[in-house]
């Protein structure tokens, strides 16, 4: 498909309605606010004793892999991560992605976008909840019965919705909601079956031991192990200690692809490229220790899942994102070269930082990289609103990567073509 298939508006609408701004300039009085869930310890303990944990498995064939596990580390500049001894060891076991980009700052919008195809102008880490008419990767996976889960280290129980859960001995920050992407969606938390798939690391260990792993999983270490409250050396060592035994586990490795990446870089004033590695049993020996220079970003996670299992799309930035090369090669998809000259960290005024702005409608007419239309249920929900927004020239791009200093119209419009939906 052409990327212009995902573009709904022209440069004029951009100039009128999509002024990019620095993250700290949004008017806090206009922020959409939500009631924070902060249960007491006794309430948490009571809920934990009554919570059921899902064990859902499936065996759906994929073009390049049968299982895809994503692990997010935290807040590290590319060069620092690339220079870490433990991460360098892991890189020798797989493929280093030298041109993989986070989307914005701070953490939470990157997590949100990785499963939802958009971060809806979120520019902080506050408590949010996306309404039930906003879909995510789970809706796509469910169309083919592809099992999925999240594994959140030290979450007190499956489906915990609280803002955080501290270490009960040291009271240090431990589990945090902002690093749990699927818990941010009402169509997950209001569905008990889905909620039971939001598990913790004890459940992960059990699922490995019992050979009950899902086919898709998002894995988040706690605030110590992911490097947020420690160092890249600490996070790198944790990553090696966590992954090295799994790389020797025949059950885990079979037909599995692992993406180890970072939510964002640390230094906001430089480009938001993050160190990333592909690992797993689907990596052929001849590619171990190699590098892939293709442009990817967090939306490539969604695009790769869609292409691997030939799924429909969400109508957001999943539809035009580059696909991981191991999947692209298996599906005859040609990735595009992306000019990263103006990839800097800017945000924009939109749904989550201005309550006067409507939710951007997904593009219900587009075709994704693997030739599939939008998910039928999304089209049914959003078709009228999409037509309305297009007729009103409502701009729906969520790019954060265009320099605010760019004034050349041709450069500006060509860059935005890649990131309009």
From Swiss-Prot:
GO biological process per UniProt: phospholipid catabolic process
InterPro entries the UniProt entry points to: Alkaline_phosphatase_core_sf, Phosphoesterase
Keywords for this protein: Hydrolase
GO MF: acid phosphatase activity
Superkingdom of this protein's organism: Eukaryota
Active site residues according to the UniProt entry: 229 (proton donor)
Enzyme Commission number, as recorded: 3.1.3.2
Catalytic activity, as annotated: a phosphate monoester + H2O = an alcohol + phosphate
Keyword set includes Hydrolase: yes
Record protein name field: Probable acid phosphatase
